Amino acid sequence: MASKNLFVLFFIFALFAANIAALQCPKNSEVRNSPCPRTCNDPYGQNSCITVIRETCHCKGELVFDSDSICVPISQC
Protein backbone atom coordinates (compact mmCIF):
# COMPACT_ATOMS: atom_id res chain seq x y z
CA MET A 1 0.00 0.00 0.00
CA ALA A 2 2.84 2.39 0.83
CA SER A 3 4.44 1.82 -2.56
CA LYS A 4 1.13 2.59 -4.28
CA ASN A 5 0.82 5.85 -2.34
CA LEU A 6 4.41 6.72 -3.19
CA PHE A 7 3.73 6.10 -6.88
CA VAL A 8 0.64 8.34 -6.79
CA LEU A 9 2.60 11.12 -5.08
CA PHE A 10 5.41 10.80 -7.64
CA PHE A 11 2.90 10.93 -10.50
CA ILE A 12 1.25 14.08 -9.11
CA PHE A 13 4.67 15.69 -8.63
CA ALA A 14 5.66 14.82 -12.21
CA LEU A 15 2.49 16.44 -13.58
CA PHE A 16 3.09 19.54 -11.49
CA ALA A 17 6.72 19.79 -12.60
CA ALA A 18 5.72 19.42 -16.26
CA ASN A 19 3.31 22.35 -15.95
CA ILE A 20 5.98 24.54 -14.34
CA ALA A 21 8.38 23.83 -17.19
CA ALA A 22 5.75 24.64 -19.83
CA LEU A 23 7.05 26.50 -22.85
CA GLN A 24 6.52 30.27 -22.70
CA CYS A 25 5.89 31.73 -26.14
CA PRO A 26 6.30 35.35 -27.25
CA LYS A 27 3.35 37.69 -27.80
CA ASN A 28 0.93 36.61 -30.56
CA SER A 29 2.27 33.05 -30.58
CA GLU A 30 1.17 29.78 -29.02
CA VAL A 31 2.50 26.30 -28.31
CA ARG A 32 1.82 23.67 -30.97
CA ASN A 33 3.08 20.17 -31.70
CA SER A 34 4.02 21.07 -35.25
CA PRO A 35 7.65 20.81 -36.36
CA CYS A 36 7.40 23.58 -38.98
CA PRO A 37 7.11 27.19 -37.75
CA ARG A 38 6.24 29.86 -40.33
CA THR A 39 8.81 32.62 -40.81
CA CYS A 40 9.34 35.63 -43.09
CA ASN A 41 11.79 33.52 -45.11
CA ASP A 42 9.50 30.49 -45.10
CA PRO A 43 5.88 31.72 -44.75
CA TYR A 44 4.40 28.26 -45.34
CA GLY A 45 6.72 26.47 -42.90
CA GLN A 46 7.93 23.99 -45.51
CA ASN A 47 11.69 24.53 -45.19
CA SER A 48 12.08 25.38 -41.51
CA CYS A 49 11.04 22.01 -40.10
CA ILE A 50 12.91 20.55 -37.16
CA THR A 51 13.59 16.82 -37.20
CA VAL A 52 11.84 15.99 -33.94
CA ILE A 53 8.16 16.73 -33.42
CA ARG A 54 7.89 18.55 -30.11
CA GLU A 55 6.06 21.48 -28.63
CA THR A 56 7.35 24.71 -30.17
CA CYS A 57 6.07 28.26 -30.45
CA HIS A 58 4.14 29.21 -33.59
CA CYS A 59 2.66 32.55 -34.55
CA LYS A 60 -1.11 32.81 -34.33
CA GLY A 61 -3.31 33.21 -37.38
CA GLU A 62 -1.61 34.60 -40.49
CA LEU A 63 1.39 35.96 -38.57
CA VAL A 64 4.97 34.72 -39.15
CA PHE A 65 8.21 35.01 -37.16
CA ASP A 66 10.56 37.77 -38.28
CA SER A 67 14.35 37.61 -37.86
CA ASP A 68 13.97 38.68 -34.19
CA SER A 69 11.42 35.91 -33.46
CA ILE A 70 8.57 38.43 -33.24
CA CYS A 71 5.24 37.54 -34.84
CA VAL A 72 4.42 40.00 -37.61
CA PRO A 73 2.10 40.11 -40.63
CA ILE A 74 3.79 38.87 -43.81
CA SER A 75 3.45 42.40 -45.22
CA GLN A 76 5.94 43.61 -42.57
CA CYS A 77 8.64 41.11 -43.50
UniProtKB/Swiss-Prot annotation:
Instruction: Tell me the disulfide pairings in this chain.
Output: C25-C57, C36-C49, C40-C77, C59-C71
Q: Which UniProt keywords apply?
A: Disulfide bond, Protease inhibitor, Secreted, Serine protease inhibitor, Signal
Q: Function of this protein?
A: Highly specific for fungal protease and subtilisin.
Q: Name one Pfam family in it.
A: TIL
Q: Which residues cross the membrane?
A: none
**Keyword Phosphoprotein carried by entry:** no
Kindly provide the name given to this protein in its UniProt entry.
Fungal protease inhibitor F
Gene Ontology MF terms in the entry = serine-type endopeptidase inhibitor activity
Q: Which residues form the signal peptide?
A: 1-22
UniProt tissue specificity: Hemolymph.
Residues with site note (Reactive bond): T51, V52
Q: Which family does it belong to?
A: Belongs to the protease inhibitor I40 family.
Cellular localization per UniProt: Secreted
What cellular component GO annotations does this protein have? Answer: extracellular region
